[in-house]
């Protein structure tokens, strides 16, 4: 299911652990085609074309939310930033919060930023400005800078903030009797399959479009983060503590990243009441799950349960289908939309080169350029 590549991957996949082999066998038993997830983590010593050396991953388990002490994981601070600084043409200004893009005519002239430590305000002139500050902040900066026409859900006019999409995240937790050394792992160490992603399967009698990738990852369990107990376990007291300790190294999670389609009622805008520390309106997210989301969620959940049962757990628990969106429990931060790319200013914020239609020297870069969220992370 992988797309065509101009050249092979630079290194072999990360190690296939016993847990991943167990998932692979079960997936094949259900007729699917699992493969190791490509990862920006060195599986062996590697020197980049820029001359940056990366050591192999040690599978320490402190990876996906941490810096890498081995320089095995590709991060800005050990890839392009040191290379850029060596040219003498790059300066990194820390604690600088850009609050406005300055525009004159059909070009931007720079940015206004605030030193977050001293609260001093600075004007930085620029020949070219690149927004690369995540989906939400890219949209907010354009809005507070009054660049582009903000989307109005009542009329359908405007493009800025339009097309905000999320993800659906079906999943199941499996409990086993044998310990699995789950403290070891890496941020993208895992196995997945695309048999139920995109149009890789028949949608004739289904009530949704698109699909999602199903995966099992071994990122390194940490006690506070991971505290699964089997269904029926008491939620407090000695029974809970015993079950939590026993199952810490005996539970696995199978999950999916499901597509999210753009709807007129889901969008980003500026809040009319609440402001940030600099007196600017906060970004407001108007969003809820749809029947499309729920139908896809329920279908993928059944497919997850099939592979889960093939792994022969002693118990399992599936995530319930989503009702209304709730921002409190963490679900995903792989959002899209709000600054989508397209063929004209009437239907998009940027062109195919990610240049803003209203300012040729302003580039808006990020997952916000996608008009919907696919069945894997953008």
Question: What is the role of each PLM region?
Answer:
Residues 157-284, 288-294, 332-337, 347, ...:
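FAD cofactor-binding and catalytic pocket of flavoenzymes
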Residues 37, 59-63, 99-104, 249-260, ...:
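A glycine-rich dinucleotide-binding beta-alpha-beta segment and adjacent secondary-structure elements
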Residues 82-86, 116-123, 341, 347-357:
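A short acidic-Thr-Gly-centered motif at the start of a beta-strand
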Residues 372-378:
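A conserved FAD-binding loop/helix module that cradles the flavin
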Residues 1-97, 328-331:
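Conserved redox-cofactor binding core of oxidoreductases
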Residues 49-54, 103-109, 332-335:
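A short, glycine/Asx- and small/polar-enriched loop/turn
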Residues 86-87, 96, 100-104, 111-187, ...:
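Glycine-rich loop(s) and the adjacent beta-strand/alpha-helix scaffold that form part
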Residues 46, 140-142, 374:
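Short glycine-/acidic-enriched loop or helix-start segments at secondary-structure transitions
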């Amino acid at each position: 299911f992988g797309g065509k590549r101009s050249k092979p991957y630079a290194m072999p996949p990360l190690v296939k652990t016993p847990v991943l082999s167990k998932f692979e066998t079960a997936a094949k038993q259900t007729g699917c085609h699992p493969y190791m997830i490509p990862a920006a983590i060195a599986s062996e010593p590697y020197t980049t074309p820029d001359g940056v050396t990366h050591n192999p991953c040690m599978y320490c388990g402190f990876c996906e939310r941490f810096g890498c002490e081995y320089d095995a994981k590709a991060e800005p601070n050990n890839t392009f930033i040191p290379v850029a600084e060596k040219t003498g043409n790059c300066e990194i200004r820390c604690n600088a919060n850009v609050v406005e893009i300055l525009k004159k005519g059909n070009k931007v002239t720079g940015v206004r930023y605030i030193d977050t430590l001293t609260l001093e305000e600075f004007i930085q002139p620029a020949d070219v400005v690149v927004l690369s500050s995540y989906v939400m902040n890219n949209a907010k900066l354009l809005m507070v800078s009054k660049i582009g026409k903000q989307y109005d859900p009542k009329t359908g006019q405007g493009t800025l903030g339009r097309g905000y999409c999320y993800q659906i995240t079906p999943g199941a937790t499996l409990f086993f009797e044998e310990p699995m050394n789950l403290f070891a792992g890496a941020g993208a160490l895992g196995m997945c399959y695309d048999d139920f992603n995109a149009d890789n399967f028949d949608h004739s009698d289904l009530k949704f479009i698109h699909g999602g990738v199903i995966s099992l990852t071994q990122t390194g369990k940490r006690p506070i983060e991971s505290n699964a107990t089997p269904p029926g376990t008491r939620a407090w007291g000695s029974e809970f503590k015993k079950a939590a300790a026993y199952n810490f190294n005996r539970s696995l999670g199978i999950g999916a990243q499901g597509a999210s389609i753009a709807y007129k009622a889901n969008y980003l805008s500026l809040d009319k009441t609440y402001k940030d520390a600099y007196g600017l309106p906060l970004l407001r997210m108007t969003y809820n799950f749809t029947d499309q989301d729920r139908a896809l969620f329920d279908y993928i959940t059944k497919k997850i349960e099939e592979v889960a049962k093939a792994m022969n757990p002693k118990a399992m628990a599936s995530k319930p289908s989503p009702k209304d969106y709730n921002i409190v429990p963490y679900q995903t931060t792989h959002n899209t939309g709000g600054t989508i790319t397209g063929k004209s200013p009437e239907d998009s914020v940027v062109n195919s080169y990610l240049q803003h239609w209203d300012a040729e020297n302003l580039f808006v870069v990020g997952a916000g350029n996608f008009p919907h969220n696919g069945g894997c992370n953008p």
